[in-house]
C-alpha cells in the first residue's frame, strides 16, 4: 500500500509564505524597537550622570522654594552667582542650598537675619522669614578661594555655611546648579 501525499494548493502556499514573511517582519520590528529603547535608556543615563543629574529633595531647609519630595534637575556648570541654588556633596549626602557669596566676597548677617554681601543688603524675596539661625562663625566673614557661602531658604532650621560643621562649599564638591523642577507636576518649571 502506497501513501499518497497531496501537494498543497497554490492558495495554501501563498498563505504560508505570507505568514512566514509576517513573522520575520514582526521579529525585525520587535528587535529594532528593543534596540532603540536600550539606546534611549543608555543616552538618558549618560545625560543624567554627566550633564543633568536628577535629585530628590529631602527635608525642609529650602522651603518655601523647594519642598520635601520635589524632584529637580541640576545643570553641571562652572559659574555660580549669589542667588543660585546649588546641590553639593556633604558627608556622603547631597544637600541643596542657595549661594549667598562667592570666593573672596564678604558676608555679614545682622541680629534680625538680614544678609549683606560685600556690605550691600541682599534682596531675598524667596525667604518667608528672616532669622539668624544656627551661627557659630565670626561675622563679617570672608569666603575663602574656590569656595561658596551657602544658606537654606528656611533660615531658622537650615544648617549651612553659618555653621562650622558645614562651612563653605568647595567648588569640587558642587554637583550643579538647580535649574528645573519636574515633580510635582503642579509646580513643574524653572526654579528661581
Outline where the language-model segments fall.
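Hydrophobic membrane-insertion alpha-helices, especially the h-region
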Residues: 32-50
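Soluble "head" domains of membrane/secretory-pathway proteins
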Residues: 2-30, 50, 56, 64-70, ...
